[in-house]
Regions:
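Residues in flexible loops and secondary-structure boundaries
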Residues: 9, 13, 18-20, 37, ...
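Acidic, low-complexity intrinsically disordered segments
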Residues: 43-80
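N-terminal segment of the canonical double-stranded RNA-binding domain
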Residues: 1-34
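Contiguous segments within soluble domain cores/interaction surfaces
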Residues: 6, 18-20, 38-43, 70
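A mid-sequence interfacial segment
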Residues: 1-3, 34-43, 78-80
């Protein structure tokens, strides 16, 4: 599932940890810079754990929005 935020497409790709049945978030942020070109994308992850895929997906989108807004030190979309 994807969400658009400030012109960026955000896609959550949560990962289940087999050894603990918990989930960790991974989110892909992409943007089309030029019409007809391939999208540029960057993947971000966190070391936080969640009890369900739904929670990890929701937190992944929130995490990506914070990265776009410059609220997560050390992470940015400047390379896109």
């Amino acid at each position: 599932m994807g969400f658009v935020y400030r012109g960026f497409l955000l896609r959550s790709k949560s990962i289940q940890l087999v050894e603990s049945n918990r989930w960790t978030l991974q989110v892909v942020v992409s943007i089309h810079k030029d019409s007809g070109s391939e999208p540029r994308e960057q993947t971000f992850s966190s070391e936080n754990f969640f009890s369900s895929k739904e929670m990890a997906d929701m937190e992944g989108i929130i995490f990506a929005r914070k990265i776009i807004d410059g609220e997560i030190p050390g992470l940015s979309i400047d390379l896109l």
